[in-house]
Amino acid sequence: MFVTNTSAQTPKHEIRAVWLTTIQNLDWPRSHSAYRQKQELIDILNQLQRANINTVLVQARVRASTIFPSTMEPWDICMTGTAGQNPGYDALQFCIDECHKRGMECHAWIVTIPVGKWHTDGCKKIRARYPKLIKKVGEEGYMDPEQGFTGDYLAQFCRDVTRRYDVDGIHLDYIRYPETWKLKVSRAEGRRNITDIVRKIHRAIKAEKPWVKLSCSPVGKFDDLARYRSGGWNAYTAVCQDAQGWLREGIMDALFPMMYFQGNNFYPFVADWKQHSYGRMVAPGLAVYMLHPKERNWGLDVIRREMNVLREEGLGVTFFRSKFFTDNTKGVYTFTKDFNASPALIPPMTWMGKRGPQPVKTLNVKRSMTADILNWGGARDNSGADYLLYNVYASDTYPVDVNDARNLICARYRGQALNVPHKGRSLHYAVTVMDRYGNESQAMQSRGNDIRERRQIDFRQLIIGK
């Protein structure tokens, strides 16, 4: 991800996420042409990149149906307009690749318990193989949390995604009892049932790739507070979702609570999530869709205040949904571009106890007529993950302050060479190494004076590869 430097101070580490919804083609894809779908996604990600968004939660399992080839479940109807039809490409792989090109994390959003209408392909396929696994509530099918194999099935599904794809996270949605479910067990037993499912998924993905984050989107209010009531709709009691307990137990790396509220329905419950985060990541979901006149017609000030408080509290932010954000509803995109004046890295997974990578051993800078050409090498990973990432910093002050987000010009970069347009300036550079857990090495610095002393390289030589 290449970005321009700005003067506004923003945190160096902060989750800035969006939910990219595929069900019913709400955010993407908007057409059934594979070519147009790819162009649409590129346009969306370019917009997100310009607003310094660093995490995309893409809905990959929709309703027992997928946007990628799977032996377990059929293609979702959103891809071609026909359920089960192959669109001719792997949309999840394409999204991962395009996110990584832009220095963004890509998390596979997995809708867990709901499996769609009773007679849809995905629901029927599971019922045919496992007749006791799906329960009908009204016209909808749901995986039964009280069947032990539900956790096994979902763990197998998430393991398959983790093994086959370079996802940065598995994001569980609806990991709870449905609100329409007639609970026949105690609330405590219901919570144990859901927690058992989470444990199985956690074990499965960490056995494959321990750096892959496991997260979920819990109901926005965990439970009643001493001074503020949840109005009967909360995670812990209403739907048996002990999300704070999952952080405490260490079987969840991050939470994205669906905090689609304002005022006293928002701020006290934000404080509660922070107080019980146990050192893990929390990035509350904000209801940017509520800004739309056909929804609640909120004023932009509601979202603006919430974003300011979340930043002051050291929490991340997640937007629901992507289209309302990129459509600049009530100016939310414009505000966010200014608010996120500098890029940010994802907070490191320090609880995994991994030793950070060794820094690069060499950093060379050559100067052409238009760009500084950086090359580096010699870094070493200590985490056992599959590859390293690099962050590049630039400043007119030496040494470059790598703790200042304003100096970060390229984040989560896979290569070991970069051309930086210098526009006639003499800049100092620093490169750090980052492992898949987000641990960052010490910086290798290069002085601008060294650049000025080098022979100027004709840009025409660069074009012909000399």
What positions do the PLM features span?
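Active-site-adjacent "subsite" loops/lids of carbohydrate-active enzymes
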Residues: 13, 19-39, 92, 96-97, ...
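Catalytic domains of carbohydrate-active enzymes, especially glycoside hydrolases
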Residues: 39-66, 164-169
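Aromatic-lined carbohydrate-binding/catalytic grooves of carbohydrate-active enzymes
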Residues: 51-87
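Aromatic- and acidic-residue-enriched segments that line the glycan-binding/catalytic groove
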Residues: 66-81, 114-138, 175, 180-188, ...
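Aromatic-lined carbohydrate-recognition surfaces of secreted/lumenal glycan-active proteins
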Residues: 100, 105-117, 171, 190-236, ...
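Substrate-binding cleft of secreted/luminal carbohydrate-active enzymes
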Residues: 243-244, 248-266, 280-353
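Pro/Thr/Ser/Gly-rich low-complexity, intrinsically disordered linker/stalk tracts
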Residues: 331-384, 437-466
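Beta-strand-rich modules
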Residues: 419-441
